[in-house]
Each structure stands twice: as C-alpha cells, then as structure tokens.
Amino acid sequence: IVCALLFVAVDRMQSAGSAGSKDTLTVYNWGEYIDPELIDKFEEETGIKVTYETFDSNEAMLTKVQQGGSAYDIAVPSEYTIESMKEDGLLIPIDHSLVPNLQNINEDFLDLPFDPRNEYSIPYFWGTVGVVYNPNLIEEHLTFESWDDLWDPSLERKIFLVDGSREVIGMGLNSIGQSLNVKDDALLREATDNLIKLSPNIKAI
C-alpha cells in the first residue's frame, strides 16, 4: 500500500485557540517523524520557536483539527485526507514563492488529482506499508506471496495490524482482488466480511 505524506497549511481561523506569535511555528505531525535535534537546530538557526504535536492516525488528526481548540500552522496528513480538509475549509493556499525548494521535488509527486497545482499541499515523503514476518516462527508452507496466507489458521493470534483504517480496508480489498481505491458498496462489504474472518488471527492493532 503506497502512502504519501504532505505538508499542508492549516487555516488557524478554524480554531478557537489563539493565532499565536509570528515567531512561533505550530506543527502537527505523525509521531517519530522528525528528530527532536532537527527541531532544536531549526530553532537555533531561525530564532523561531516550534510547538510540535503528534498524532497516530489521519482520522485522529482530522477530528482534532475539525473540533478546533488548537491552532496549527502546518499539518502532515496522508494524501487521501487532503481533499476532505479542503472541502471542510480547513486549509489555506500555500504561497509557492516562499517555497523555493519546490522546484527540487520529483514532478511525479506534483499536480496530483487530490490537489491540482499543489495549491494546498507540498509532498513531504512517500513510502509503503507492507508485511513483515519472521520465517523461523511460521509454518513452512507460508510464503506471503498471496494475501490469503494471512488467513491461515496457523497464524491464530499472531498478527499485529497497523492502526490505519485505509491500510486495513485496503488489505481487505486486495485480498479479494480489488484496488484499495474501490468505492463500490458491495465490494467494500465483501472486503469487510473477509476482514472479519481474519479476526481470530489478530493479536493486536
């Protein structure tokens, strides 16, 4: 499953909190995505104080921003969250003249359908969510060349799932031969039913 993370400028007016100082940058990001030493270096070189908060899922981030109460300058959601944030009026346009390094970003990651012309977001990085396993602790017949292997009875209470609704439903869709971008209700129900069958093998999320 491919995921892209993007910086977005959050509309502070959506928050009931103070707009803060021009010498303070409030960032809302995934946990463990920026080294604290890098933040210290940024503050030392710029004189700008960074208030850094973290979240563990796009849904948690979106809920907190929607509810207000905290004012953020920058948030780092995955690509599929951008469109919802735009529709809810949670973002403000980015002035590209203030981002000279934009020219150094691979064009394959720019001007994508969820944000044409990158009006509201700038790519941060991208990666994949995969399957990691210890071959010494599983049955020899399991190769994980097929999603079906995860449903093998020998894996009862041995699987840890990532805490991400899109990643999990995407796995369910892939397991029935469908794209994770499917919107058809019948296929989504089929994928959900298949995930329910996987539950005996899940130890934790």
Model-predicted regions and their roles:
Residues L6-M13, G17-M85:
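Early extracytoplasmic/lumenal segment of secretory-pathway proteins
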Residues A71, V76-I205:
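Extracytoplasmic ligand-binding site segments that recognize negatively charged/polar headgroups
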Residues I1-L5:
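Core hydrophobic alpha-helical transmembrane segments of single-pass membrane proteins
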